[in-house]
């Protein structure tokens, strides 16, 4: 039951613009009623597209975010719930993400890369110390909190508490940044985040992921075998130390891969200009007092109108590959658009209540796939299911040829059901084959690289992926998570 059934999110916030959309949610910009200058991102999740299992995913996201207080992790303030929606009040980050920064300004020099990586590794260290694995670290989920290089890690829709002794089994994430143990259908642990960090470091220096191909099956095989190399034309620009760190992070054997603490102790990270790093940290100070940590924007109002929000109850979930068909995605997306237009035009006509419950421990042996994404390119918004969800569980099958065949079949089938909702004018048209011919100082990723950022769900020997059909993904609006 809501802790305050007489209060609505619209009692505290004026919702203005839609700034991001996803399969199950819409993100809007809002300001606080009493402090107009304070802006927030409101993530509105429609219950019309949430079944019980997907609701559990939302509970996990809220539970993890509510426990995170770190300068390099997006802030979560409170949440509200009504019969129609679940609303998360989040920090608004207006300066774009890492992908857009590379596209607009080109690759980083080593000092810029060092500042970004130390901040990212600091966030990952914080999560790993709390037994949380993020599972979807990629440029689109790394947000710039200021113009000094300060970053925030966002989008915790796939994050999960886990036990190191048990590990995780069901694969999810984004293919171009996924570790070999995921594509090989192996039990994996927090080291998958370190692999993703290695891909990020490579990306910001060379303008593309280490594993990239227009052919999805080829990219899958490259990751599985761990086959990559430094670009011959540009690798000379960077020190042996940074290339050594990349090699250690992109180690195929997860047991030999650097941990986050080892990465922070690496010579290249340790050689950072502490004055520069300190100036970045000052731009996004860590909340220290317990009172500040628990204070929500709504608490700025009088006590009679205050609203509390605690973590919802978490329930164990059976192993699940959350797959939706293209038609279901199209329907859900249209419903979300209609639903949120209604919200924007008549925001005070409905009441949303703060949700309150106690968190419980989730059975770590039960694994889930969370498709609660809201990315601004629609290759990340839907997962096409062309296989029966009740397929036989061949747990010992690691036949990569079968995996690749399934991957290709899903790609071909989805080409016939492709749906784009971004404007053609927003497309970046640069041929990936011409990447090596771009001037070294201005090398930038093509927009087609967004096609590599697809959520995947792998269970045992089955490969399921969201594929756009067109290799050039059209760019959408800024998503703050």
Swiss-Prot record:
<dbReference type="InterPro" id="IPR000719">
    <property type="entry name" value="Prot_kinase_dom"/>
</dbReference>
<feature type="region of interest" description="Disordered">
    <location>
        <begin position="345"/>
        <end position="427"/>
    </location>
</feature>
<feature type="compositionally biased region" description="Low complexity">
    <location>
        <begin position="379"/>
        <end position="421"/>
    </location>
</feature>
<dbReference type="GO" id="GO:0005737">
    <property type="term" value="C:cytoplasm"/>
</dbReference>
<feature type="binding site">
    <location>
        <begin position="19"/>
        <end position="27"/>
    </location>
    <ligand>
        <name>ATP</name>
    </ligand>
</feature>
<keyword id="KW-0808">Transferase</keyword>
<comment type="similarity">
    <text>Belongs to the protein kinase superfamily. CAMK Ser/Thr protein kinase family. CaMK subfamily.</text>
</comment>
<dbReference type="GO" id="GO:0004674">
    <property type="term" value="F:protein serine/threonine kinase activity"/>
</dbReference>
<feature type="domain" description="Protein kinase">
    <location>
        <begin position="13"/>
        <end position="269"/>
    </location>
</feature>
<keyword id="KW-0067">ATP-binding</keyword>
<comment type="function">
    <text>May phosphorylate a specific serine in the N-terminus of a myosin light chain.</text>
</comment>
<keyword id="KW-0547">Nucleotide-binding</keyword>
<dbReference type="InterPro" id="IPR011009">
    <property type="entry name" value="Kinase-like_dom_sf"/>
</dbReference>
<dbReference type="GO" id="GO:0006468">
    <property type="term" value="P:protein phosphorylation"/>
</dbReference>
<feature type="active site" description="Proton acceptor">
    <location>
        <position position="136"/>
    </location>
</feature>
<dbReference type="InterPro" id="IPR017441">
    <property type="entry name" value="Protein_kinase_ATP_BS"/>
</dbReference>
<dbReference type="GO" id="GO:0004687">
    <property type="term" value="F:myosin light chain kinase activity"/>
</dbReference>
<feature type="region of interest" description="Disordered">
    <location>
        <begin position="285"/>
        <end position="315"/>
    </location>
</feature>
<dbReference type="InterPro" id="IPR008271">
    <property type="entry name" value="Ser/Thr_kinase_AS"/>
</dbReference>
<feature type="binding site">
    <location>
        <position position="43"/>
    </location>
    <ligand>
        <name>ATP</name>
    </ligand>
</feature>
<dbReference type="Pfam" id="PF00069">
    <property type="entry name" value="Pkinase"/>
</dbReference>
<dbReference type="GO" id="GO:0007165">
    <property type="term" value="P:signal transduction"/>
</dbReference>
<keyword id="KW-0418">Kinase</keyword>
<dbReference type="GO" id="GO:0005524">
    <property type="term" value="F:ATP binding"/>
</dbReference>
<protein>
    <recommendedName>
        <fullName>Probable myosin light chain kinase DDB_G0284661</fullName>
        <ecNumber>2.7.11.18</ecNumber>
    </recommendedName>
</protein>
<keyword id="KW-0723">Serine/threonine-protein kinase</keyword>
<dbReference type="InterPro" id="IPR030616">
    <property type="entry name" value="Aur-like"/>
</dbReference>
